[in-house]
């Protein structure tokens, strides 16, 4: 019984996040990602930024010397 509930709630979460992306909810995430990327630059130098393109996730590395 518990297993089916967990699976169902997981599916609902996935559908919810897809809806959020279509509504432009990802803009909030990208703002936070930019802020985090800035923090990483100050701490370590090289930083990794994440771009979500549809279903795919792309990682780009930036090196600052």
Curated annotation (Swiss-Prot):
Residue ranges with Basic and acidic residues bias: 12-42
Spans annotated as Disordered: 1-47
The entry's keywords: Transport, Viral movement protein
Pfam families: DUF5428
Any one of the GO BP annotations: transport of virus in host, cell to cell
Keyword Acetylation among record annotations: no
Keyword Transport tagged: yes
Parts of the chain that traverse the membrane: none
Annotated Polar residues bias: 1-10
Family that this chain belongs to: Belongs to the carmovirus/necrovirus/panicovirus movement protein p8 family.
Role, per record: Cell-to-cell movement.
Protein name from the UniProt record: Probable movement protein p8
């Amino acid at each position: 019984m518990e297993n089916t509930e967990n699976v169902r709630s997981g599916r609902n979460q996935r559908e919810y996040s897809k809806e959020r992306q279509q509504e432009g909810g990802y803009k909030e995430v990208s703002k936070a990602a930019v802020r985090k990327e800035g923090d990483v630059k100050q701490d370590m130098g090289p930083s990794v930024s994440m771009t979500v393109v549809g279903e795919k996730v792309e990682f780009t590395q930036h090196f600052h010397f």
